[in-house]
Amino acid sequence: MRVEMRLVDWNPGYFLPTVAGGLLAAGGAAAFGWVRLSELMFGFGFICWVVLGSILLLRLFTQPALPNRLLPVIAIELAPPVVAGNVWFAMNGGRADFVARVLAGYALLMASVQLSMIPSYRTAPFGPAFWVFAFTYVAAVTDVIFWLKAEDADYSKAITYVLLALSTLGYAALATRTVKGMIRGTFLPEYPAAR
């Protein structure tokens, strides 16, 4: 399990193959009613989140800032708690229990970090890293929709429609900026990418 990699080279993108993979597999298993497999895969994703999350937070707190082009990948820090929240709702029948509230609490913390990062995100050149917002924020919207249903919130249908409209507009903006960047030749980094 030894990896020849400097701490400064780590970034939140490493959550995707392990944490997201395990949690999404748990959600899929839960959808098919495979309880034991969903629990196993949830454990896999959760433990990977704890281990990698510790490494990544250490990197973000103690090492030089990520290159400007990679700043948007910090948005992935919001993904584990909201994806885990979505999966937990699928596993427990949509109840807002203790685990759901713990995941929501951490999701709120990471969402507040995202709000504080807006000025930094605005300085980053638009490129592929911005597509992490698509997965992360749609997972967050889905988690909010699960919460609205679990809490039987007033106006939940209207709030859901607003959230879905905002998500759709976000995807449209990403797609539009991507196409413009591709046409201008500014979307992809120059090869070879600078370290």
Model-derived features with residue positions:
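Structural signature of hydrophobic alpha-helical transmembrane segments
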Residues: 36-51, 97-108, 164-167
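Hydrophobic alpha-helical transmembrane segments in multi-pass integral membrane proteins
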Residues: 24-35, 81-95, 139-154
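Hydrophobic membrane-spanning alpha-helices of multi-pass integral membrane proteins
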Residues: 76-84, 106-111, 133-144
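Short, highly charged, low-complexity non-transmembrane loops/tails of multi-pass membrane proteins
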Residues: 186-195
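Cytoplasmic-side transmembrane-helix entry/capping segments in multi-pass membrane proteins
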Residues: 8-17, 67-77, 126-134
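Membrane-interface helix-loop-helix junctions at boundaries between adjacent transmembrane segments
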Residues: 1-45
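C-terminal ends of transmembrane helices
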Residues: 1-7, 53-68, 113-125, 176-182
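Membrane-helix boundary elements
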Residues: 62-66, 73-98, 118-119
